[in-house]
Amino acid sequence: QSIFLFLLITLSASAQQKITLEEIWGGAFRTQGMDELQSMKNTNQYTVLNFDRASRSMQIDLYDFATLKKVNTLIDTKNFPNLPMIDSYTFNKSEDLILLACNSKPIFRRSFTADYYLYDTKNKQLTQVLDYQIQEPTFSPDGKKLAFAKDNNLFIYTISSQSVEQITNDGVKNRIINGITDWVYEEEFAFVKAFDWNASSDKIAFIRFDESEVPEFTMDVYNQGLYPVQQTFKYPKAGEKNAVV
């Protein structure tokens, strides 16, 4: 009987606890996590992408593994009014340049295009890579260049001169893809980037997909306005031809 009374009192007390709108919208029940955690090379430190709700700004903060305390803030978007919210980031080999991805637009499950910015942690300078969206920009091992894909072709961006060199020319939507996987490889093998630099930063190896003979599939996309937009892409069903690699 005493156990029953104890449970009754406990349940009654818990039932009287109220949840307020201030708690709901103020984040009292928001789960805590770490976004874009990256371990730094040859140090006992790591970086995390944080969001400050009070200032509506984002920071890439440096932490110590041993103490879990913040050591430094590498970049804060509130110091750069023209810098959008950061979706992800990548360091070069020497970890003095940070490649920032912003305004990401999804293509399929893993692929996306984005606006990219380079931040020099030594001189605190921010530079927009290009004034259009690109895919999978990748630092060369010497940190002087970026290889990237756009419109099914591959390009090289030289950081010092901000110049672009096109290295493939036959890329065509729903026909030839250079350096980026087709839908099948992305979906079944879970990767998008199909190119990489050699160790001396003077050559790029890449996979070329010829999907000319792959049947097309068209679907309606309903999230872009009052009326749906049709998206047509190469989609090999069972028994149909796959892309030639």
Task: Pin down the residues of each PLM region.
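Sec-dependent N-terminal signal peptides
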Residues: 1-11
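Beta-propeller folds
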Residues: 15-245
